[in-house]
Design a protein with these regions (language model features):
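Short, well-structured N-terminal submotif of metal-dependent ribonuclease cores
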Residues: 1-40, 53-60, 120, 135
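General small-molecule cofactor/ligand-binding pocket signal
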Residues: 39, 75, 126
Length: 135
């Protein structure tokens, strides 16, 4: 199974968001163990760094980036992705980019806590909890 993991799920783990960390961490671990083929979009990386920069030093951020690129394949952004995303019926351009990336890698799901934001995505959105129920 191939999944594109949305930025919020990664941040649940990195920020230890009590309400969400358990299932998000299990998804992360399934990708790490290669039980699931995990992808993140290149867009997620600068967003993660931007959010984490206030709490972590540069070295720790480098370690996190190294770990992320070991666990997940990073889907590069192409000019055509940006243009396709702009044409999709999404309220949020970043979500549209995630959808385009998921489509390009033929992901089975977009793993996100914001399923409602992806109702117009050709790739079905699923919560971490929903994904884990399939195992």
């Amino acid at each position: 199974m191939k999944v594109l993991v949305d930025t919020n799920v990664i941040l649940d783990v990195l920020c230890n968001r009590k309400e969400f960390v358990a299932d998000s961490l299990r998804v992360f671990q399934c990708c790490e163990a290669q039980r699931i083929t995990g992808y993140i979009s290149a867009l997620s990386i600068p967003n993660i760094v931007y959010i984490m920069r206030k709490e972590l030093d540069t070295e720790k951020i480098r370690e996190i980036l190294h770990t992320l690129t070991m666990v997940f394949s990073v889907v590069e952004l192409r000019e055509s992705d940006l243009l396709k995303a702009a044409e999709l019926p999404f309220d949020d351009y970043e979500d549209a980019i995630q959808s385009v990336c998921a489509t390009r890698v033929r992901a089975d799901y977009i793993v996100t806590r914001n399923e409602k934001d992806f109702v117009n995505s050709p790739v079905q959105a699923i919560s971490p909890t929903g994904l884990l129920k399939q195992f």
